[in-house]
């Protein structure tokens, strides 16, 4: 989630695979549409999703799959899939049709994540990824410049690492600032302001309006069916830690030698300890909230949630300060 700049945004991969909250009315429409169900059961269901997804964009990706797999924080049972759906408005939907939808959407996610890796890494992408895209080459047609940066002349990794006036970011400080602000701060702000903040504000009589002019909603909650919201939000923060530490080890206690934190150390960034402390406190705040109430949906308006909002906002402030200092 801290890497939503570049290919994920330019090629609309993130909204394609991670749209939420789930569009319930659209999901009802999809799962009761005989022609769409037939497409999900076709010989090439993932291609059907790729070609026809304008009819069900709000139910694609991880959260469409979540709806099929989980209810009330529990795995759905085999017996549940042998029967009809029990969700309001869907009681005519057969479990086997839901599984067809699940498999089709999962195949589409597989293709999109392969595309994300390939457009960042180019020929350095794994052989498995290259094979997925070779078998499903139609996905390139939906991408700008076949998915690549600088009008198709290079992969996004190369683009990020070659600052130049004509092809990449204009300077190294600009590149690092993009990582801090366009990457890390972007998801950090979303977690505290929207993923946690919107439901908390509404439940504490502080709800406002969204960018679209709609009233904020207490139901604006990610992963409500699996009850894994806090887990998801902590993973969002781990993506920030991975970015700063130069590692994929979320339990790392020190940054890699060639990492942004090590770079800040070498440059004698005066507020390095404030950044580190804010990261540690933000992660801990979600552990504390989990210990206090179990899962977000249990009490979205709680004191523990407000504490997490505040700590994650502190981290966002430190990320922007570091980005400004280096950029």
Regions found by a protein language model. Name each.
Residues 2-327:
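Mature extracytoplasmic or organellar-lumen-exposed domains after removal of signal/transit peptides
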């Amino acid at each position: 989630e801290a890497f939503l700049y570049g290919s994920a945004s330019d090629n609309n991969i993130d909204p394609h695979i991670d749209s939420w909250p789930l569009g319930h009315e659209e999901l009802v429409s999809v799962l009761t549409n005989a022609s769409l169900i037939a497409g999900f059961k076709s010989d090439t269901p993932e291609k059907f999703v790729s070609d026809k997804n304008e009819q069900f964009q709000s139910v694609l990706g991880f959260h469409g799959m979540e709806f099929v797999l989980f209810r009330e924080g529990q795995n759905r049972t085999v017996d549940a899939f042998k029967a009809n759906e029990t969700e309001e408005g869907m009681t005519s939907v057969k479990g086997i049709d839901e599984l067809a939808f699940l498999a089709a959407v999962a195949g589409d996610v597989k293709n999109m994540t392969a595309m994300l890796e390939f457009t960042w890494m180019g020929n350095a992408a794994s052989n498995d990824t290259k094979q997925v895209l070779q078998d499903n080459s139609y996905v390139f047609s939906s991408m700008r410049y076949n998915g690549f940066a600088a009008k198709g002349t290079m992969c996004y990794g190369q683009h990020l690492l070659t600052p130049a006036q004509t092809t990449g970011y204009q300077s190294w400080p600009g590149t690092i600032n993009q990582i801090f602000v366009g990457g890390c701060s972007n998801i950090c702000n979303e977690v505290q302001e929207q993923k946690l903040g919107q439901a908390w504000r509404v439940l504490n009589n502080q709800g406002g309006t969204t960018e679209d002019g709609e009233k904020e909603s207490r139901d604006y909650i990610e992963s409500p069916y699996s009850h894994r919201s806090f887990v998801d939000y902590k993973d969002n923060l781990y993506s920030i830690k991975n970015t700063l530490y130069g590692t994929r080890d979320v339990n790392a206690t020190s940054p890699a030698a060639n990492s942004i934190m090590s770079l800040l150390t070498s440059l004698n960034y005066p507020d390095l300890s404030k950044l580190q402390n804010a990261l540690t406190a933000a992660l801990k705040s979600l552990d504390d909230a989990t210990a206090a109430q179990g899962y977000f949906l249990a009490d979205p308006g709680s004191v523990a949630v407000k504490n997490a909002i505040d700590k994650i906002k502190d981290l966002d402030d430190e990320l922007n300060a570091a980005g400004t200092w280096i950029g």
